[in-house]
Amino acid sequence: MMRSLLVLVLFAMPNAHAEDLHFLVPGGAGGGWDSTARGTGMVLRNAGLIESASFENISGAGGGKAIGMLIETASHQQKTLMVNSTPIVVRSVTKLFPFSFRDLTPIARVIGDYQVLAVRSDSEIKGFDDVLARFRENPRSVKVAGGSVRGDLDHLVPALALRAAGEDPRRLAYVPYDAGGKALAGFLTGEGDVLSTSLSEAMEYRRAGRLRIIVVSAPARVPTAADVPTY
């Protein structure tokens, strides 16, 4: 399963060139949405396409609060872009919030990223088979941390992996955080046994020796983590 990060607007902006651009981030600071918004703003400034970029983080309802605000204040948001990703479709289809992804207009896909499951470098868990063994003995003994609400990709990916192994995904002990950065910080200080996150967010900490990636949700092994099995 791949996470696609999108830049969305409610409707097309009146001019191709905007002096000021405002980015609405539907999650906390330090997560994938936040870093994507800030990186996109920096690139647009450096390319001379905009004069300045501002950023606003609005957390809540798995991104639903920010989406609702953008839709309800559309007349005042002509220079606003919102960064979101594949879960916006999931949450809309499952009616986790009253708005539809069809109320927004995707204008660019900027990132495609795989999901991973990771453990701390000193963990006794060596692979997904160990996770399964612990889960089968006691589902509550394996807590999975993720930077999004229940029903989002960080929750769905380990749940689907458990279901594929013949287990009941509803028994998964999932610990949600406001953003990927907060999930990583909490996980590295000992909160949770397994981290569900994106490959790009995990790689920095893998290189630093602070965590080990045990599986990646790719159809084949990825070059940047060729030793990691897929699922």
Task: For every predicted segment, state its role.
Residues S4-M13:
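Sec-dependent N-terminal signal peptides
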Residues H17-D103, R150, E167-V194:
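N-terminal (or domain-start) structured segment
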Residues L21-G27, G31, L132-G151, R212:
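Short loop->beta-strand "edge-of-pocket" segments that line small-molecule binding or catalytic clefts
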Residues D34-R38, M42, H155, A159, ...:
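Short, surface-exposed alpha-helical segments at coil->helix boundaries
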Residues E201-Y231:
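C-terminal lobe and pocket-closing loops
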